[in-house]
């Protein structure tokens, strides 16, 4: 495939993203500068979140995405996935619960690291 053909595919993907969501996330904008990176990344995103063969319904998928983005502290991803979740009929209470689950997982992860250090530091006391 020529560089021009790759650029054309990348531009079509960007247009589809903008048409679907009303904006193009910064990550996609930057990655699209290198079609060899952007095209497979966009395909993976579509497979993970929008595939016709997915086992999870869109509401559940986007609740998972909100929880994961929350756990990672990815502010812009929380907003983007939250917007998709709301469009998939997720209620405010459901969204808040997913955010709590993600927050809790992040909290226990940091506690896990910290408390292991604590145990190591004071194991003989």
Which ranges hold each PLM region?
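Short conserved catalytic/interaction loops centered on acidic-Pro-aromatic/His motifs
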Residues: 78-83, 113
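Short, thiol/selenol-centered motifs that function as redox-active sites or metal-ligating centers
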Residues: 64-80
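Amphipathic alpha-helical segments within well-ordered protein domains
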Residues: 46, 65, 82-86
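Short Fe-S-cluster ligation motifs
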Residues: 100-117
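Acidic, glycine/proline-rich low-complexity segments that act as flexible tails and inter-domain linkers
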Residues: 1-58, 113-125
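Iron-sulfur (Fe-S) cluster-binding segments and ferredoxin-like electron-carrier domains
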Residues: 81-92, 118
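Alpha-helical scaffolds flanking conserved acidic
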Residues: 57-63, 92-98
């Amino acid at each position: 495939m020529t560089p021009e053909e790759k650029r054309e595919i990348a531009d079509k993907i960007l247009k589809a993203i903008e048409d679907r969501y009303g904006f193009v996330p910064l990550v996609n904008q930057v990655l699209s500068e290198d079609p060899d990176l952007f095209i497979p990344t966009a395909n993976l995103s579509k497979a993970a979140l929008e595939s016709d063969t997915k086992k999870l319904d869109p509401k559940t998928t986007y609740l998972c995405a909100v929880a994961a983005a929350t756990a990672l502290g990815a502010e812009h991803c929380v907003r983007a996935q939250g917007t998709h979740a709301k469009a998939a009929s997720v209620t405010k209470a459901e969204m808040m619960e997913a955010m709590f689950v993600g927050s809790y997982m992040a909290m226990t992860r940091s506690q896990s690291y910290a408390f292991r250090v604590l145990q190591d530091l004071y194991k003989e006391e």
